[in-house]
Amino acid sequence: MSDILQKIERYKREEIASAKAAHPQAEVEAAARHAPALRGFAKAIRDRLAHKQFALIAEIKKASPSKGLIRADFDPPALARAYEAGGATCLSVLTDTPSFQGHLDFMVAARAATSLPVLRKDFMYDTYQVMEARAHGADCILIIMAALDDAAARDIEAAALDLGMDVLLEVHNEPELERALKLRSKLLGINNRNLRTFETTLATSEALAASVPNDRIMVGESGIFTPADIARLARVGIETFLVGESLMRQTDVTSATRTLLAKAS
């Protein structure tokens, strides 16, 4: 596991312990069972792809460990509406505070402002976080294979599926891909960013795509800035894209989203 992931896991487990002390698991699970109705994250993507269109998971992200502050003018509801107007299929909202200046409240506010399904983008280490995500309205969670062993990944996936949620499995290399393919979820994100070095190359997606079975929906993640990047990934069968930084840096987010999708189509 990389140094950055080790650091993140340490503070995440402290966060989880504090959250459990404040809100016991039974309480959060009850809230999850009575959360707002699911919107169907994977279904929204499948429907878009069925119409022969690219599917965009548009990300609301204030900052990152590698780039620092990305957007000072940060208004999650306004950004969510801008993405929806620009043609996004789903939203991804960073909820990690120490590394990304995110918050669960940002996800709640973004989801309330649109009709789009929402991914809680965070580092998941405990099924408690799954309950917490659903209790706050999330339709999908992220599992980073580099951060978890197989048993933990399986338990977290099962908790999400039991609640009717979707799961995006994220991989960066062949061993992680092989592990992810043993799980049930069909959404498979290929992260072009190396979480150890922060180097980003679309060649990662190009190298792994051929090993992904046809029943999986590949999602290109990181390093996607232009229609040419989308076209490059589309050539290896990737038609769903998670894009954050390049759109977050634009003054007119709706126009930038629309342009990215229009020129890529």
UniProtKB/Swiss-Prot annotation:
Domain of life: Bacteria
Top-level enzyme category: lyase
Keywords: Amino-acid biosynthesis, Aromatic amino acid biosynthesis, Decarboxylase, Lyase, Tryptophan biosynthesis
Pfam families given in the database record: IGPS
EC nos: 4.1.1.48
Descriptive protein name: Indole-3-glycerol phosphate synthase
Gene Ontology molecular function: any one: indole-3-glycerol-phosphate synthase activity
InterPro entries per the UniProt record, alphabetical: Aldolase_TIM (IPR013785), Indole-3-glycerol_P_synth (IPR045186), Indole-3-glycerol_P_synth_dom (IPR013798), Indole-3-GlycerolPSynthase_CS (IPR001468), RibuloseP-bd_barrel (IPR011060)
The organism's taxonomic lineage, starting at the top: Bacteria, Pseudomonadati, Pseudomonadota, Alphaproteobacteria, Hyphomicrobiales
Biological process according to GO: L-tryptophan biosynthetic process
Family per record: Belongs to the TrpC family.
Species for this entry: Afipia carboxidovorans (strain ATCC 49405 / DSM 1227 / KCTC 32145 / OM5)
Catalytic activity annotation: 1-(2-carboxyphenylamino)-1-deoxy-D-ribulose 5-phosphate + H(+) = (1S,2R)-1-C-(indol-3-yl)glycerol 3-phosphate + CO2 + H2O
